[in-house]
Amino acid sequence: HRQEARGLEIRLCEDIKSYTKLVPALINFPNAVIISVDDDIIYPIDFVERLYRAYKKDSSKIYFYRGHYILFNEDGSPRPYLECVVRGAKGCDIYNFPTGVSGIIYPPHCYHEDMTNKNLFLKLCPHADDVWFKVMTMLKGTLCEHIPTPHFDSLFIPLDIDETSS
């Protein structure tokens, strides 16, 4: 109750698998800036501040700490998923692929209108929310900018949590 007194709001929502982390917030707060995080990481103390500072610099972009870069075949088609991404997103590019484990800040309306279409994402991409989110932001044309973080692995500390209980 103490956190609720400070402004924390807890809402129950439908379980839509891994999409539950972001989609209900997008539906209920369509004009909000939203930060996505995982519950099995200890984050640096300035984690939110750095994301928000980047957002304030240019509110049209998605900012993230950790991600990949999408690779393509010579004919321009994307490589299969397991070959398609390499860790090492850099700079600002539409082909940067943020990974949610280390935090992402989404500006309002940075995604295609189908982003929250439950029937569509559960049919086309039921187990890969990160792929769905990336495609929806690419369709909108939103750039993704990597926030360089020296000593990343020592700042973002994973907790050893059983996946079935989280």
Identify the function of each model-found stretch.
Residues 113, 118-166:
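C-terminal catalytic/acceptor-binding lobe
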